[in-house]
Curated annotation (Swiss-Prot):
Organism: Pasteurella multocida (strain Pm70)
Binding site for Zn(2+): 173, 175, 186
The protein's name: UPF0758 protein PM1152
Residue span of motif JAMM motif: 173-186
Keyword Transcription: no
Keywords from the UniProt entry: Hydrolase, Metal-binding, Metalloprotease, Protease, Zinc
Record SUPFAM superfamilies: RuvA domain 2-like
Length: 224
């Protein structure tokens, strides 16, 4: 109780040093990033206003340069810094996948795929190639555009898998509409890839469909 009361009286930087970053609210984390407020507006007030404008950290971090810089108190310097922080986070998650048994940390896989795919304007079909201990060998964007049976070629996926000696695959693609519910075509493509993979004893561990702040897992829904 004493620590809780004490944390309320601390500025964000001091609070982070005392209790660690997870103890901070979104507003406090953003205030540290912004560093200073503007005339007539403290940094905490500015942080609160920014989050209200973009609705969430996700909304802020996915904003375009124009959307970001049109808000009073934000400029090109902060936009560049935010893009750098976002990219470092993505690369950190990718390194985590390489250092861990990927499927035993499926939440990390999902977070990484959401970070890399959910704000894309076109559909992108990615494949994570894993070894027999489910560690990441490589990640590859295989196909761009509308995902259907005419644009996705299972043989190309299997060819890449055999070339890098992959034992298992995780499939993923995004829905720019924001709705992750798989289409009939998504299901058919997944079935064809799974059938082709089984012929060479490669497992399909999951197929993630990434929407806006949400996802659909074929494995979790027992479609694999």
């Amino acid at each position: 109780m004493q620590n809780q009361v004490e944390s309320l009286s601390l500025m964000p930087r001091e609070k982070l040093l005392r209790f660690g970053a997870p103890a901070l609210t979104d507003e406090e984390l953003l205030a540290i990033f912004l560093r200073t407020g503007i005339k007539g507006c403290s940094v905490m007030q500015l942080s609160r206003h920014v989050l209200q404008h973009f609705h969430s950290l996700r909304g802020l971090m996915s904003a375009t340069q124009t959307e970001f810089c049109q808000l009073k108190g934000l400029g090109i310097t902060q936009f560049i810094q935010l893009q750098a922080c976002t990219e470092m986070s993505k690369r950190y998650l990718q390194e985590e996948l390489k250092l861990t048994q990927a499927f035993k940390n499926s939440e990390n896989v999902r977070f990484y795929l959401q970070a890399t795919l959910e704000n894309k304007e076109r559909e992108i079909f990615q494949v994570l190639f894993l070894d027999n201990q489910h560690r990441l060998i490589k990640q590859e964007e295989m196909f761009l555009g509308t995902i259907n049976c005419t644009t996705i070629h299972p043989r190309e996926i299997i060819k890449s898998a055999l070339f890098c000696n992959a034992a298992a695959l995780i499939l993923a693609h995004n829905h720019p509409s924001g709705n992750p519910e798989p289409s009939a075509s998504d299901k058919m493509v997944t079935t064809k890839i799974q059938a082709a993979a089984e012929l060479v004893e490669i497992r399909i561990l999951d197929h993630f469909v990434i929407g806006k702040g949400c996802y659909y897992s074929f494995a979790e829904n027992r479609l694999l």
